[in-house]
Amino acid sequence: MQKAIRENPEQCRILQNGQMHPLEFLTGLVMKETEGRAVPQVVKSLIKDELNISVIYMITTGGAISAVRNKDGTISAGDSTVLKTISEQIAPDTPLQVISAGQYLSEELEPSDWAELIVEINARISAGTASGIVVTQGTYTLSYTAALLYWLFSDSEVPIVITASSSLPLESTEAEVNLRLAIETASKEKNGVFVVYGGKVLSPLNLHFERPGIFSNWNLTSQKFRESGPVATQFSGISDLDQDVVSRLLAEASRKMFMCRLYPGFRSEIYNKMLKYSSVHSIFIEMYGIGSGNMTDSDYSLKPMLLTGNRRGMRFYCTSQQKINLDFSQYITAHGVWREGAVPMGYLTTESAVALYFACSLCADSDAELDEMMENYAALYSN
């Protein structure tokens, strides 16, 4: 390795300036000298350490943080150019590569967009070229994306920092402030998944939108950034992801799930009609309080929907509208829900539980395995 570095000073200089293609060239020289016995990932890591290389990848996906205001006053997704310009201004001494993984407003987020982001992150980690990754995204679906990346990449050896902005980059300093802290966090941390917003470093789990400019973590006694569970452990061993396959798996998962919220006047019959003629397998229900619901024999009872779902082999996963720990053991109304096989998702918020479902869908080989994984996580994230 040292011979390859010594004999190729120009390639090393380019590498130290943040252009990563010489890393493959130098790694190839080492592999040739060792007749293929060296491990490419280890070689890349050693070269980076030897040359003191610290490259941050910024993966952009759109949102207000890179959006533009049109002449008619409307807002549309921009491109990564503005983020590259801002990053060069706020972190001129940090080698940074900006990569686009789609440009859309966060309310337009679809499973295929997640697939592109997941594959891009995985590729940067697997290549051994990233010392940190910053992901920019819109605020409306930030709670879902942050949790998804936590479930998948919390065991990664590269820190991943997600950030966003509620205002446009040319109309406020919010994007600049958040990007600066995101880059600093990605440069400082060794691993884990983080969210940077409003001058704070937050956990990606149970991320809750309070109001423009403010996110917080609900229902956590301590912030969680690492070791989310078995899915992340399994995912960290995958080095080559096919984007089409990931997109198909996520699309299939979205087709087989449904989400509803209890409210005064909730009528099971409306949902039963949908469930009888659909391929839905997993249903998320936002319950009242710690898991209460109407389980009487009235027209406004949840019970008929649970019974219909059970007959069709569907699974019910419950979260709390009040964002508190679900506990079916106290209220008599919760006992009835539990009796029908509904699974309380502990202290996970709806967004984190739904993101967990998508993460498990990428690793499960069958509905039965998916059900088992979800129940194991429910137990793991219950107080």
Residue spans of the language-model regions?
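Charged, compositionally biased, marginally structured helical/coil segments
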Residues: 1-53
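Active-site histidine-anchored catalytic micro-motif
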Residues: 54-383
